[in-house]
Amino acid sequence: MAEEQARHVKNGLECIRALKAEPIGSLAIEEAMAAWSEISDNPGQERATCREEKAGSSGLSKPCLSAIGSTEGGAPRIRGQGPGESDDDAETLGIPPRNLQASSTGLQCHYVYDHSGEAVKGIQDADSIMVQSGLDGDSTLSGGDNESENSDVDIGEPDTEGYAITDRGSAPISMGFRASDVETAEGGEIHELLRLQSRGNNFPKLGKTLNVPPPPDPGRASTSGTPIKKGTDARLASFGTEIASSLTGGATQCARKSPSEPSGPGAPAGNVPECVSNAALIQEWTPESGTTISPRSQNNEEGGDHYDDELFSDVQDIKTALAKIHEDNQKIISKLESLLLLKGEVESIKKQINRQNISISTLEGHLSSIMIAIPGLGKDPNDPTADVEINPDLKPIIGRDSGRALAEVLKKPVASRQLQGMTNGRTSSRGQLLKEFQLKPIGKKMSSAVGFVPDTGPASRSVIRSIIKSSRLEEDRKRYLMTLLDDIKGANDLAKFHQMLMKIIMK
């Protein structure tokens, strides 16, 4: 119905444009109104007369007769919805007879039909369309009950003559209005207006035209598979359409067991098929149609639970796949948790490294302040009376002044030193070191780090044995030298043996 109403709106707009482009003469309007009056008197010939009038009117398209308005003072007449129009009800709407000649538009109505084709009165349809007609650009369309609440125009606004045109709010409408913004006039009001218009030639300017579509075909409504749109109002319900089922599939229900015992002999029931829970669609085969039973139907005849088993197996496969996905997700989550733990350990390692770097920096700072004294050897040639030679200054490893550690090792106090003689990191102070800091002279006949001097002690013999064992001589020669070492007596013989051994090893 929405598509049909939209088509009516489109045709009405085309009529309006045609009327504006080529106004209709008064003679053509009178002829059309006369034909319309005959249609209203004989409703059975309504459609045939409409076709003749539409074919005879000049410069108009097919739906133009539904929206013809007088532009030259003519008196239009409007089709009624069946016989029974009264000529005595001009005062029911509060419209004087003298104002009936001011009408320049026609009024037509929409009826709402149910699915059986019967007209329903007083039901508002959000998709009913009120089309604009006439040449006047200020003509308006009145909204429905819901939309009159949001209208900017006061309800019951009087016209120029001081009479109320309608009891509903009205608002201007443009060419691109929505179908849901238009109301359906009440059936009683439409009948009253049609009676008044069919009688008098003068009619107040209503400012709207209602298009009356033909009643729907009940047979078409019953066979249509598409539900009819009943609007967007929450108070309305869509009942849809009913379609007779043409399918032959289904399962035959089991018959109840009769409690009474049969009086006669029983019939054999060995070939009776068992009951099934469901059955596939059985298509009747005819030579003309050429249809055959599908292989799936034949397979279903072999076992009633085939589809159930297949569906159960599919469900089991889906459950197995979901369980596998869940297991994989759990593995991924566990790995992510381990990664988070490793991240925490890495952060703790970084903190420990930072602490160690701080400690190393602290140790470097302490080492930079340490002074190491390096004493000299031998006697001072300028002081022959001195027992030992002392280092003229204490040289630090890391750059410091040379006189910093002298106060701790010299006999003289720090205040008695001559500081003016300190130049280029050296001092002229000649004070003696304390006894515990003085070095003893090295004896040439005693073993030291400078060289090994053998004696008659067991330590000297152990050193010579170690020299023989660590040498790269043959094993026989090593055993022979060990035997000679055991036989040597005296310090001189041992010193000669040591010299001979060193010559053999150095070869």
Curated annotation (Swiss-Prot):
Stretches with biased composition (Acidic residues): 146-160
Region described as Interaction with N0: spans on this chain: 1-48
Pfam families in the record: Paramyx_P_V_C (PF03210), Paramyxo_P_V_N (PF13825)
Highest taxon in the source lineage: Viruses
GO molecular function terms listed in the Swiss-Prot or TrEMBL record: metal ion binding; RNA binding; RNA-directed RNA polymerase activity
GO biological process: DNA-templated transcription; viral genome replication
Biased composition (Polar residues): 286-301
Chain intervals for the UniProt region annotation (Interaction with the nucleocapsid (N-RNA)): 459-507
Compositional bias (Low complexity): 134-145, 260-270
PTMs per UniProt: Phosphorylation on serines by host CK2 is necessary for the formation of viral factories.
Function of the molecule: Essential cofactor of the RNA polymerase L that plays a central role in the transcription and replication by forming the polymerase complex with RNA polymerase L and recruiting L to the genomic N-RNA template for RNA synthesis. Also plays a central role in the encapsidation of nascent RNA chains by forming the encapsidation complex with the nucleocapsid protein N (N-P complex). Acts as a chaperone for newly synthesized free N protein, so-called N0, allowing encapsidation of nascent RNA chains during replication.
Record note on quaternary structure: Homotetramer. Interacts (via multimerization domain and XD domain) with polymerase L; this interaction forms the polymerase L-P complex. Interacts (via N-terminus) with N0 (via Ncore); this interaction allows P to chaperon N0 to avoid N polymerization and non-specific RNA binding before encapsidation. Interacts (via C-terminus) with N-RNA template (via Ntail); this interaction maintains the P/L complex anchored to the nucleocapsid template during the sequential transcription. Interacts (via C-terminus) with protein C this interaction allows C to associate with the ribonucleocapsid.
Family: Belongs to the morbillivirus P protein family.
Domain remarks: The N-terminus consists of a long intrinsically disordered tail. The central part contains the coiled-coil multimerization domain (MD). Forms a four-stranded coiled coil structure. The C-terminus constitutes the alpha-helical domain (XD) that binds to the nucleocapsid (N-RNA complex).
Identification of the protein by name: Phosphoprotein
Lineage summary: Viruses, Riboviria, Orthornavirae, Negarnaviricota, Haploviricotina
